[in-house]
Amino acid sequence: QLFPDWYLAQHRQTTLQGKDAETLSKAFDSIVKRCLTAPTVHVHRDFMPRNLMIPAHPGTTPAQQLGVLDFQDAVHGPITYDVASLMRDAFLTWEEDFVIDITIRYWEKARKAGLMDFEDWHSDFGAFYRAVEWMGLQRHLKVAGIFARLTLRDGKPKYLADAPRFIHYIRNTTHRYRELGPFLKLIDQIEGFEAASGYAFGRV
């Protein structure tokens, strides 16, 4: 309830009722259903550039070349979660061709590790990428709500200043999937935006 309670109700002063509330509920149901079908692994939950440290001194071994911070909340969750967190970052916006390139590299390494033996993911990067997008959508909605709460309840305005990035992610993703069309229209209505556009592996 972070998104409707904090981002919509508190930040946007919008309480959804009737058809709009039903649209949000159906979108959330679809997102949860998609995300829960993914295979699970250990996930960091906040895998982003700010939590990745590279030593400044030379002579380190490959195992010492990357430090990972803030891992105390790691859980067992969808294999799509960390790559979605990294490539749709809270504080940095990557070009979409770069996002796709890095996600392909992740997919290829995961295939070699035997982690893509699910449905047609092993042979179809597009299927995996769509799953990453749905996982990212869940995270974007949650974090938009968290950032609104941090600002409005906890007095930390710097967080809500990054909320437009998440709305951009949400709009671009919902634009690609027909079943999320009503949700996109609802977001556009609340934000006062026109229709979004972006890459898609076939609009589905």
Model-based region annotation:
Residues 1-45, 53-69, 77, 161, ...:
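ATP-dependent phospho-/nucleotidyl transfer catalytic cores
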Residues 2-11, 79-119, 134-154, 166-173:
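Active-site activation/catalytic loop segments of kinase-like enzymes and analogous catalytic loops
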Residues 12-22, 113-131:
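Short, surface-exposed acidic
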Residues 21-24, 99, 137, 159-163, ...:
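Hydrophobic packing residues in well-ordered alpha-helices of helical domains and bundles
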Residues 39, 44, 72-79, 129-137:
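Secondary-structure capping and boundary motifs in well-ordered enzyme cores
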Residues 49, 54, 75-77, 100-113, ...:
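Glycan-recognition and catalytic cores of secretory/periplasmic carbohydrate-active enzymes
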Residues 63-66, 74-82, 94, 107, ...:
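Conserved catalytic cores of large enzyme domains
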Residues 142-204:
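ATP/Mg2+ or Mg2+-diphosphate-binding catalytic cores
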